[in-house]
Regions:
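Membrane-lipid interaction segments
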Residues: 2-445
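Primarily a LysM-type cell-wall glycan-binding module
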Residues: 438-475, 480-496
Length: 496
């Protein structure tokens, strides 16, 4: 007798690996001809931009955008120059080769600039990269069987799966007014994109978002001014089919950008061109029905059962906190600008099904003293947050700093988001193979068996032992459900 098993293959994705690495780059560079000769470096800040990710080779390539603020004896006011320091990192984790998409969370452990001469600089940067590798997995479950006299034991299970990951990039260009402020030069700038909505329309994914822009400018009278602006962006991603009833989450990071002044008769404008990385994650709940055991009333069968490991994942949980700092001055007004900030790495403590997270936020603030000379100060604040559950992966994100000046005080607030991603492993015991066993000396079987259920025995095990069926035992004993009586049980033996 031939027994045919039917299998269902479920395609999903999972976090296959997590790797971290640090890398040091040093370089020497000359100031461009249009820059004034430097006499003293006031501040050096860096932004890490990942341009290329190659999972098959385990390579991460990008640049550190180093912006240097300095003073010059040749001219008044604060000067700046931006230098791109390329880097490449090779990760040795072999599981990265199995990944289809890499998500990189980066920070700079060190960014420093020193003067060799008035026109030559020494730069040193140490980026830290935390790489999450997402790869494809196939779940193979036995969902049916055909054969004479087969009795099937089935089970239903609700699964939360990461059903799709996809990475794309897009370009955007925007212009906006900054008013008649006599802007002369952009000294520092930073952009942070964020997605506000996403919608699946056929095979297209429509994404809308905003780009937060922060810039430090020098005006024509050599004063400093901070500019904060938000501009919209939208993108249609073609060829992306999100599984039905999925929850979509889109993460975005800047790949490169250029912010420039556009001078005209009506005032001053800024123009932004940027290239943005978009990473699409789709989560969905799916019910699966699979066979955990089977037997035949016509013959003796040997059943093989395997454990299929499923990692159930939902959308990352996000909790936002604020890192706050207060600057005070004896003057009536205080100008300040955050040149760089770092959230560090999250420390996780799990207790009673809840994770307590903490991080130290470090910020460098540029302000003007009582003589209106530019100076910098470093501050740090520890922040804490709580997340339900015990996430296996935690990372940090932040928005642009908010500054509020009033009566000789300046309050600095930096929004910090704690992200927690929890993967719960579930083992599904499912039939993977069956084999008919030939009995050398088959013994005659009775037509009915009368016995008392053993402690802990279930209806399925009794039916399987005596080549019966659960339904036949229920009918013979007038049972409404699978609850076994305390007394004797009539077990009809089904014969081919």
């Amino acid at each position: 007798m031939d027994t045919e098993l039917e299998f269902e293959q479920i395609l999903c994705y999972d976090l296959l690996t997590k790797a971290a690495t640090t890398h040091e780059e040093t370089t020497e560079t000359n100031l461009p001809d249009y820059c004034a000769t430097a006499s003293r470096i006031l501040d050096a800040s860096g932004l890490l931009l990942v341009r290329e990710k190659q999972p098959a080779e385990g390579m991460i390539r990008g640049e550190v955008r180093v912006s240097i603020l300095y003073l010059s004896e040749e001219t008044e006011g604060l000067q700046s120059v931006t230098v791109m320091v390329p880097f490449s990192c090779e990760l040795s984790d072999p599981k990265l080769r199995e990944c289809q998409m890499l998500q990189v969370h980066s920070r700079l452990l060190l960014c420093e600039a020193k003067l060799i001469t008035g026109r030559k600089l020494y730069l040193r940067v140490i980026p830290e990269l935390t790489v999450l590798g997402f790869g494809r997995k196939t779940l193979r479950l036995c969902c049916g069987a055909e054969g004479k006299g087969l009795q099937l034991r089935q089970k239903k299970q609700q699964l939360s799966l990461l059903s799709m990951v996809e990475e794309r990039s897009c370009n955007t260009a925007q212009e906006f007014d900054i008013g008649p402020n006599g802007a002369e030069e952009i000294l520092l700038n930073q952009v942070l994109p964020r997605v506000t909505s996403s919608q699946q329309i056929g095979s297209k994914l429509v994404i809308k978002g905003e780009i937060d822009i922060s810039a430090l400018i020098r005006t024509s009278d050599r004063k400093l001014q901070g500019i904060v602006q938000t501009v919209p962006f939208s993108q249609i991603l073609d060829g992306i089919t999100v599984p039905d009833e999925s929850t979509i989450q889109v993460e975005t990071t800047p790949m490169e950008w250029d912010l420039r002044l556009l001078r005209g008769e009506g005032g001053c404008r800024m123009g932004l061109t940027a290239r943005i990385t978009l990473q699409v994650f789709a989560y969905r709940r799916q019910e699966v029905c699979y066979i955990t055991d089977l037997y035949s009333t016509c013959c003796t069968m040997k059943t093989q059962v395997e454990a299929v490991s499923v990692t159930q994942r939902g959308r990352p949980v996000c909790v936002r906190e604020w890192a706050e700092e207060l600057l005070e001055s004896g003057r009536g007004s205080l100008f300040a600008y955050v040149t760089s900030f770092d959230c560090g790495s999250a420390i996780t403590r799990c207790d009673s099904g809840r994770a307590e997270l903490s991080a130290t936020v470090r910020m460098r603030i540029l302000y003007q003293d009582e003589n209106e000379a530019p100076v910098t100060a470093e501050r740090s604040r520890e922040i804490r947050a709580g997340i339900e559950g015990c996430p296996d992966t935690v990372w940090l994100g932040s928005g642009l700093p908010e500054l509020r000046s009033n009566a000789g005080r300046c309050q600095v607030r930096i929004p910090v988001c704690f992200y927690g991603c929890t993967g719960e492993t579930t083992e599904l015991q499912t039939v993977c193979a069956v084999e008919e066993v030939t009995e050398e000396d088959p013994q005659p079987r009775p037509s009915i068996v009368l016995r008392r259920p053993r402690p802990g025995e279930c209806l399925w095990n009794i039916a399987k032992e005596h080549s019966s069926s659960e339904e036949a035992i229920r009918q013979c004993n007038h049972l409404e459900d699978d609850t076994l009586p305390e007394g004797m049980l009539l077990i009809p033996v089904l014969k081919a």
